[in-house]
């Protein structure tokens, strides 16, 4: 809800547990128009919290005085509509508030930084040197079954509306090479690739495999990153920023 100057009322999801009674986004006054998914800092009681401008119309009554948004993280692009829809689904499924779940999935250090401090972190990331040029990898020849799987996956990627596919194969049957070829097709189409690993112990091995394959294609310092519980808070923020900004 905005006026002609762009100011108005925004809904903001904040980290408030379900049992607190604050089960949904709260209304705040904003001096500028803010897109859904924008990260902000807002007051709640005596605290100041990280919040996310949430999709949907505000509910404030005209005679109610609203507290203002304190700061806007305008150095970051808003979180996407699909991300917000996923959080809405998860909040409903797990019976938690959207702000509580958002706080759990965003990097912990993000909750502690001001927009100015975050901007300084981003400038530091931009100064990271690029990796040395790597030779193009030698790809193994595909077995007929692998080639058929790669063809079907890449056709869906090219079509623009991929559907879930189940790749079946026993251990050692060559599934990882199919994943690598599918990732290569997605990267060639200008997209990002998210790989879910079943257990943390497999992360270094799989990350090394992807780095070896794509080092020549992705020479950036943070082109391939991982997110898991063994990372330090600073590493987690750095890697999340790389993914969110599209450099990873």
For the regions a language model picked out, list residue spans one by one.
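Accessory, non-ATPase domains that flank or precede helicase/AAA+ motor cores in DNA-metabolism machines
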Residues: 1-248
